[in-house]
Curated annotation (Swiss-Prot):
HAMAP family according to UniProt: IspD, IspDF, IspF
Protein name: Bifunctional enzyme IspD/IspF
Spans annotated as 2-C-methyl-D-erythritol 4-phosphate cytidylyltransferase: 1-243
Binding, 4-CDP-2-C-methyl-D-erythritol 2-phosphate: 250-252, 276-277, 298-300, 374-377, 381, 384
Record has Lyase as a keyword: yes
Cystines in this chain: none
Pathway, per record: Isoprenoid biosynthesis; isopentenyl diphosphate biosynthesis via DXP pathway; isopentenyl diphosphate from 1-deoxy-D-xylulose 5-phosphate: step 2/6; Isoprenoid biosynthesis; isopentenyl diphosphate biosynthesis via DXP pathway; isopentenyl diphosphate from 1-deoxy-D-xylulose 5-phosphate: step 4/6
Gene name tied to this protein: ispDF
Amino acid sequence: MQAEEQFSCGVIVVAAGRGERAGQSSEGPKQYRTVGDRPVITHTLDVFATWDGTGPVVVVIHPEDEELFASARKRMGHMLDLTVVHGGATRQLSVLAGLQAIAGAGVKHVMIHDAVRPFFDHALLDRCRAALRNGAGAVLPAVAVADTLKRAQAGGLVAETVPRTDLHAAQTPQCFRLEAILSAHRQAAASGQADFTDDASIAEWAGIPVHLVEGSPDNFKLTLRRDLSMADEKLTRMAIPDVRTGNGYDVHQLVEGDGVTLCGVFIPHDRKLSGHSDADVALHALTDALLATCGAGDIGDHFPPSDPRWKGAPSHIFLEHAARIVRERGGTITHADISLIAEAPKVGPHRQQMRESLSAMLAIAIDRCSVKATTNEKLGFVGRNEGIAAIATATVVYASGGDA
């Protein structure tokens, strides 16, 4: 069996529909309508363009849409080699045209996807690929039906309630062994079977077991005009990054000792910082800054000084805890900045080691970690060498629409 990194799938993107239910538009069928500043089909193709399992790609379009597709292709965010073929009078015939075009491309598996489902992701593609690797001949992503279903009768009356147990809503991409689904499509065409609504139905008809994998609630099909409006709103929201900045401040008293710990780095000195933990004033300030980006309180809420467990504790525990909370809430730490205010010891000789320490604790690149130091010009308690203060700023990007 192929190794996962070598297991690629041919892709057929079905884009030959007319989309009457979405209403007429000067932009053409719904796959060419603009959502999030680009045609729908470009969002769909970009997902495949950035997935590591994408093999040969065939796009099936309507014969009248060549100019529309050529224009849309120029708007793609990523390069993608693809073949364009013309579809038939029905979706079923369009898919058959795509299968026949990809049959000589040297792939054993194929994914068939609706162009008007732009909100699938790599995780869904990975689940489909894993099922194919495990030997499935047909794979269907689907979501369990959550709504109560009613069967209607004449006059707009309810005839019965349909039990929803074991019912699933089918999605795409639907994935198959290429040889098997091509044969099934050819058999269906030869026998005059032309009323299948998806490719999994053809596989079922041909006796191919269809394996379910978890779909995605976001992977909805753009069918009606309101779907296009929802898609535009969703893509617009996704395009605006949720960037948050948190600030933190801390100060600790200097007492007789043999050194101070700043940013997790011990610096020999004739004094030390007094505190319940190791009194790393820099990490305490940065911990508060991270917690502030998601409204998670402050360091005292999570590690109260009255708790003996934290007596003498290394402060990297506090910072890593805050970073974990940020990530659990969908945040990506993009920058950390610390300003130390002290008369002594000199921070400059240790600055690079401090940045390396922060980089390791936060699991971010060192160029995203900044440490600066200044004196207080002999003014105040810092100027009298009675303590060290720290001001920290954390920048975090949260997943748009996520809870924080």
